[in-house]
From Swiss-Prot:
Region Disordered: start-end pairs: 1-42, 467-667
Similarity comment text for this entry: Belongs to the PPP1R37 family.
Keyword Lipid biosynthesis: no
GO molecular function annotations of the record: protein phosphatase inhibitor activity
Subunit structure: Interacts with PPP1CA.
Comp. bias (Acidic residues): 510-525
Biased composition (Pro residues): 1-12, 588-613, 622-642
Pfam families: LRR_6 (PF13516)
Protein name in the entry: Protein phosphatase 1 regulatory subunit 37
UniProt feature coiled coil, ranges: none
UniProt repeat feature LRR, residue ranges: 220-240, 248-269, 277-297, 306-326, 334-354
Length: 699
């Protein structure tokens, strides 16, 4: 039954209010919605505060190490015990003993050892009181029976507080998918984690994508141990694909994963093709087989640099696989350690490997232990030893190598000077002739003595190189007469000429290359290794800077020689000579002099002559008193340059010598104009400085 609106009883306190509401609410539009809709539309209004009030406050991120400032051991132990009581979990006595032994809390502590302790979720949560106050180099969580919850909590703590650089989580078989997910997040976010040991911790199909993504995007890991982690199949495929883009991982250990010779080995071969930063690959105790070795060799062949250590111990390899490896070794440039132990290679396999080893120049360590070798195989190995200039260690233990093989190895060591360690069985092998046993003992001793001899030779060579480097790193500056530049220096040049020295400075080879780093270093090193000489005697067929003085003027009272050895670039000796007057010389002895007037002084005077001839004195103008610009005479034509200038200035010198003394005097002005027009400003300034000083000395 409907009640008319006018008969409805009014509510308490609503006299007039209920009637006024519809009067105030309506808006003036004729097509307006009902009254309830109009009320709701009017209530929705949005306003924004002013720019000054739009940000009400700011919160800085929490410092993870805010609890580690000025902390003491007692505070750490007290906080840990309080957390254990709060979480109702047992305390770890092994942890408490280690905490009491810590002294230097301001730096990373060497190790936190929790190996063998059972860590459930609550126990792991209590460890946060330690991790928030201390950082460690090594955190050992091996065989701690971690479950998914405990592992996730621990890995989150280690990531947040950067608690460790080396983390061992091996032998934890129940960390599960969430545990591996937290571990992957830790690997990706932690910049200090360099080493992760996850041996015997299964990385299954549903967990591998997290780890692969962490290694592909960004990771600071340099060493990763995944032995016995059930990687064969899809996990290895994901891991190898991710590592193709990884440039930080240096060592990868994949032993005991039952890797096969088809899909798994193909993935590893592709990894080696694209990854040049991986240095150690350990594949021991797998099923690579000869077919898998072919894939790996294909990847190695395409590497120009990269893998340095390859361990193929116990992979059922035979002589067929050694043929693949023998063809690959000549193309490898970085492989230094190759371990083929416990594979039935046999004598034929070593023969297949021999030529590749001889052609290779990078292998330093070779492992052939327990490879079914006999004396025949030892002879092939001896041939490689005799030809190898770099081999350092060779392992031939657990092989049937008897007298004949030992004799071949002994003879090879007599011509080899690099092998430092040759591992053989200590006990001699049984022989039909009893006297051969004594022969084996003598040969074993001889082989050992040969290795000791090589060791002594290597040590002596290293000490000699160190002494040479030490002597080369000491700068030497030798001044023939330690006087100021303003004073005349007559004695050094006079003594040099009295002793018959051809000139006080080196020839063009050492002078023109003084500013270059890459030329004539070997020659300079050889000269310096013999004896550090203050001055170098130039060759008779070259002209040195000391021969630039005019023949008409004695060079002894105006020359100053300073020899400086520079150990930085080739250890060369540079000689700077200051001359009294502008240089002038006859033609060099290499091109034959054209026929001219018969006059002994007109020919090129030997550089050893200390005094000028009368004709030379007549043909050369006297410098006289010092003038502002005396270098009006042309510089000498030839490789040497004045005052050790750069070799680029040689382009400004005239290539043809004057035919005689008359032409020499007549062409002085022309040669000077050509040289001054082509030389740079530095040449003019240096010549001006030299002439001014020489003028002061003549006064």
């Amino acid at each position: 039954m409907e009640i008319p609106p006018q008969e409805a009883p009014p509510g308490p306190g609503a006299d007039g209010e209920a009637e006024e509401a519809p009067v105030e609410a309506p808006s003036p539009g004729p097509a307006s919605p009902p009254a309830d809709g109009r009320l709701k539309a009017a209530a929705k209004r949005v306003t924004f505060p002013s720019d000054e009030d739009i940000v009400s406050g700011a919160v800085e991120p929490k410092d993870p190490w805010r609890h580690a400032q000025n902390v003491t051991v007692d505070e750490i132990i007290g906080a840990y015990k309080q957390a254990c009581q709060k979480l109702n979990c047992r305390q770890i006595p092994k942890l408490l003993r280690q905490l009491q032994e810590f002294t230097d809390l301001g730096h990373r502590i060497d190790c936190l050892d929790l190996k063998g302790e059972k860590l459930d979720y609550k126990t792991c949560e209590a460890l946060e009181e330690v991790f928030k106050r201390l950082q460690f180099k090594v955190v050992d969580l091996e065989q701690t029976n971690l479950d998914e919850d405990g592992a996730s909590a621990l890995f989150d703590m280690i990531e947040y507080y950067e608690s460790a650089t080396h983390l061992n989580i091996s032998f934890n078989k129940h960390i599960g998918t969430r545990g591996w997910q937290a571990a992957a997040h830790m690997m990706r976010k932690t910049s200090c984690l360099q080493y992760l040991d996850a041996r015997n911790t299964p990385l299954l199909d549903h967990s591998a994508p997290f780890v692969a993504r962490a290694l592909r995007i960004r990771s600071s890991l340099a060493v990763l141990h995944l032995e016995s982690s059930s990687l064969s199949g899809r996990p290895l495929m994901l891991l190898a694909t991710a590592l193709k883009m990884n440039m930080t991982l240096r060592e990868l250990y994949l032993a005991d994963n039952k890797l096969n010779g088809l899909q798994d080995s193909a993935q590893l071969g592709n990894l080696l093709k694209f990854n040049c930063s991986l240095q150690i690959l350990d594949l021991r105790n797998n099923h690579v087989l000869d077919s898998g070795l072919a894939y790996i060799c294909e990847g190695l062949k395409e590497q120009r640099k990269g893998l340095a250590t390859l361990v193929l111990w116990n992979n059922q390899l035979t002589h067929t696989g050694m043929a693949f490896l023998g063809m690959t070794l000549p193309h490898t440039h970085s492989l230094e350690t190759l371990n083929l132990g416990h594979n039935p290679i046999g004598n034929e396999g070593v023969r297949n490997l021999k030529n590749g080893l001889i052609s290779n120049r990078s292998v330093l360590r070779l492992g052939l232990a327990s490879t079914k070798l006999t004396c025949e195989g030892a002879v092939a190995v001896a041939e490689f030893i005799a030809e190898s200039p770099r081999l350092l260690r060779l392992d031939l233990r657990e092989n049937e190598i008897k007298t004949g093989g030992l004799m071949a190895l002994s003879l090879a060591l007599k011509v080899n000077h690099s092998l430092l360690r040759l591992d053989l069985d200590r006990e001699p092998k049984k022989e039909a002739v009893k006297s051969f046993i004594e022969t084996q003992k003598a040969l074993l001793a001889e082989i050992q003595n040969g290795c000791k001899r090589n060791f002594v030779l290597v040590r002596e060579r290293e000490e000699k190189e160190q002494r040479l480097q030490l002597s080369a790193s000491m700068p030497e500056i030798t001044v023939t007469e330690p006087q100021p530049d303003d004073e005349p220096r007559e004695e050094p040049a006079a003594e040099a000429q009295e002793n018959g020295a051809p000139g006080p400075s080196p020839g063009p080879d050492s002078d023109s290359d003084s500013d270059s780093e890459g030329e004539d270093r070997d020659e300079a090193d050889g000269e310096r290794a013999e004896a550090p000489c203050p001055t170098l005697v130039p060759p008779t067929d070259s002209l040195g800077p000391g021969d630039r003085s005019p023949p008409g003027c004695p060079s002894s009272p105006a020359e100053q020689r300073i020899s400086v050895s520079s150990p930085g670039w080739g250890h060369k000796v540079f000689v700077v000579t200051r001359v009294e007057s502008p240089p002038e010389r006859a033609e060099p002895p290499v091109p034959p002099a054209p026929p001219g007037p018969v006059s002994p002084p007109a020919s090129a005077s030997p550089p050893t002559s200390p005094f000028p001839t009368p004709t030379e004195a007549a043909s050369t103008p006297d410098p006289g008193p010092p003038e502002p610009q005396p270098p009006l005479e042309p510089p000498q034509v030839g490789p040497p340059l004045p005052n050790g200038l750069k070799p680029e200035f040689a382009l400004a010198l005239s290539p043809e010598p004057p035919p005689g003394p008359e032409a020499k005097v007549g062409s002085c002005g022309l040669e000077h104009e050509l040289s001054c027009s082509k030389n740079e400003k530095e040449l003019e300034e240096l010549l001006l400085e030299a002439s001014q000083e020489s003028g002061q000395e003549t006064l």
